[in-house]
A protein has these predicted regions:
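Core catalytic alpha/beta fold that binds nucleotide/phospho-ligands
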Residues: 1-219
């Protein structure tokens, strides 16, 4: 079954992850109006949308719910605060009845090495270099460590965390340098911090990662 997990974070908040597969049909999981909208989307977007609605049904037991979007592009859902993320192979939803929430999932890939300077500050890069003990003076930045699984994991955690915080504070449209990562260690799952520097608000980022994906969320 493509459902990877549904996890109750607290009494009002649920997190779900779905592995995108070809066998799903839109009319099995999507409301009629969503099925009509799908006809105007490319094949990849169709698969992502169907996976999201399959997961939504698994999490709520309802097929009538329609995900909308506000002026900032943030997903909306009657009766819930919701955040949605999808990447190659996976779709994730976090939803709460009472609290703001945000989630991001990213498949493992080395693209993240090419954009280090885009989303990490020099201070954050130095922090990660220290964390990974890259003392070799011939290595200018963490971007040089493309063969390192740990380096890839650390970068993906930082990328997903900033995407998560951007979604959480969607009205502010934060820039990457307005978010500061504090990642001192990491494993298969755990927590670290990311601060909205514009408001000086530190948020706890909860993460999980394996050989296929990295996922982060906050509430």
């Amino acid at each position: 079954m493509p459902l990877v997990f549904i996890k109750d974070i607290d009494t009002d908040t649920r997190l779900g992850l779905w592995k995108i597969a070809d066998e799903l049909h839109a009319d099995e999981v999507c409301p009629q109006m969503v099925c009509e909208e799908l006809k105007r989307k490319c094949a990849r977007r169709q698969k992502e949308t169907v996976a999201v609605y399959a997961l939504l049904h698994a999490m709520t037991g309802r097929r009538d719910l329609v995900i909308g979007h506000n002026a900032d592009g943030k997903p909306t859902l009657d009766g819930y605060i919701i955040s949605v993320s999808h990447t190659i192979g996976y779709a994730s939803i976090i939803m709460s009845k009472t609290s703001n929430v945000a989630v991001d999932v990213e498949y493992r890939n080395n693209r993240v090495f090419r954009i280090v300077d885009k989303f990490l500050t020099k201070q954050e890069t130095a922090l990660l270099n220290g964390l990974l003990q890259t003392k070799d003076t011939t290595l200018k930045t963490i971007a040089s460590l493309t063969e390192s699984h740990d380096a890839q994991t650390a970068l993906l955690l930082c990328w997903c965390a900033k995407e998560t915080i951007y979604k959480y504070f969607s009205e502010e449209k934060l820039m990457f340098d307005e978010m500061q990562i504090c990642l001192e260690e990491f494993g298969q799952e755990g927590t670290f911090y990311c601060t909205n520097l514009r408001q000086d608000i530190k948020k706890t980022i909860t993460y999980m990662q394996n050989e296929e994906f990295v996922l982060t969320y906050t509430l």
